[in-house]
UniProtKB/Swiss-Prot annotation:
Similarity-based family: Belongs to the FapR family.
GO molecular function terms listed in the Swiss-Prot or TrEMBL record: DNA binding; DNA-binding transcription factor activity
Biological source species: Bacillus mycoides (strain KBAB4) (Bacillus weihenstephanensis)
Main function: Transcriptional factor involved in regulation of membrane lipid biosynthesis by repressing genes involved in fatty acid and phospholipid metabolism.
Gene: fapR
Name of the featured protein: Transcription factor FapR
Pfam family, one: 4HBT
C-alpha cells in the first residue's frame, strides 16, 4: 500500500508543479496528487497561489501588446501567453457556449482555425502579415469547456520573397487536436491608407 504524503510535502510538490506548469487545472492537480479538488483549492489558498485564470493573466502580462506588430492584440483569437517574434508563440483558447454547436457541444472548426491563424499572423515581425496559403488538419473534435493551447513555430523566413512558413500545433492537455502549416505574406512597406504594398 502506497504511503500518503503529508500535507506539507503535498503542498511543496503542488507549488513546484504549478511553477513548472502554470496552466495546470485544479482537476489535473487533484488527479495527480490523488486528493479532492476542494483539497487542491484549499492548498492553493494557503500557499497564496491564484486560480488558473489569474495565473494565465499574470503570465500574459509580459508586454505582448508592445511585441505584436502585425495586428492589435484584441484581434488575436485566444490569449497570447508567450511570444518571440519570428520564432514562436503560444496562445490559450477556452471553448465556451458561444463557440460550440448546441446539439453536440462540439466547437465549431472555424474557432480552432482562427486561433491558429491569428497566432500565425501575430508571430510575424512586420507591420503587415497576411495568410497566403494554409494546409490544416482537424484531428479530433474539441468540446465545450476544453482549453486549446496553440503552439506556433516559425519554420522558414524568406524576407527577399516576403514569405514565411509557420507551423501550428494545437493541444487539449497532451492530446494533439489540430495542425496547420501557414504560408504568410509579410511586408514592412505598409501604410494605414493601404498603399505602398
Amino acid at each position: 500500500m502506497k504511503k500518503r504524503r503529508s500535507k506539507k510535502e503535498r503542498q511543496e510538490l503542488l507549488q513546484q508543479t504549478i511553477e513548472t506548469n502554470p496552466f495546470i487545472t485544479d482537476e489535473d492537480l487533484a488527479e495527480k496528487f490523488q486528493v479532492s479538488i476542494q483539497t487542491v483549492r484549499l492548498d492553493r489558498m494557503e500557499l497564496s497561489i491564484p486560480e488558473l485564470r489569474e495565473r494565465i493573466k499574470h503570465v500574459a502580462t509580459k508586454q505582448h501588446e508592445e511585441d505584436v506588430k502585425s495586428l492589435p492584440l484584441e484581434e488575436v483569437v485566444g490569449e497570447i501567453i508567450d511570444i518571440e517574434l519570428d520564432r514562436h508563440a503560444i496562445s490559450i483558447f477556452e471553448v465556451k457556449v458561444e463557440h460550440v454547436f448546441k446539439r453536440n457541444q462540439i466547437a465549431r472548426g472555424h474557432h480552432l482555425f482562427a486561433q491558429a491563424n491569428s497566432l500565425a499572423v501575430a508571430v510575424i515581425d512586420e507591420e503587415l502579415a497576411l495568410t497566403a496559403k494554409s494546409t490544416i488538419r482537424y484531428i479530433r473534435p474539441v468540446k465545450l469547456g476544453e482549453r486549446v493551447v496553440a503552439k506556433v513555430r516559425v519554420e522558414d523566413v524568406e524576407n527577399d520573397k516576403g514569405r514565411t512558413v509557420v507551423k501550428v500545433r494545437s493541444f487539449v492537455g497532451e492530446e494533439l487536436v489540430f495542425t496547420g502549416t501557414f504560408e504568410m505574406y509579410r511586408s514592412s512597406n505598409y501604410s494605414e491608407e493601404g498603399n505602398n504594398l
